């Protein structure tokens, strides 16, 4: 009907979402505490928080204090939606600890928080992601973090 220029009604109406207000801009990132959050499912070997690779209901925080680089043998991926080989080979491709430590050393960022947050974002109902997002925001605020770098797949 649409191609012929006739009236039609879609079978799949577009979803509408509540607008999320934009946070205030960071005035000086060189004085800010920065944290990494990923929905790419990077977790320590053994998946200590039992984050599942699809429709995850949990998230975890993982210590990076005193580390300059993430090693592939220490981590695994709990996410079924992408080719994991490149991240398994070098987890810094998803959680760029090496690059962020360089920026911290140069003074480009004030401080890198000593943990990162991870979950799997694959096939997740909006109710789950909203709840987990609120929980993560509480954690970020409680830790005094000023800025978050969100990495995805």
Spans of features found by a protein language model:
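Metallocofactor- and cofactor-centric catalytic cores in central/energy metabolism, strongly enriched
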Residues: 1-153
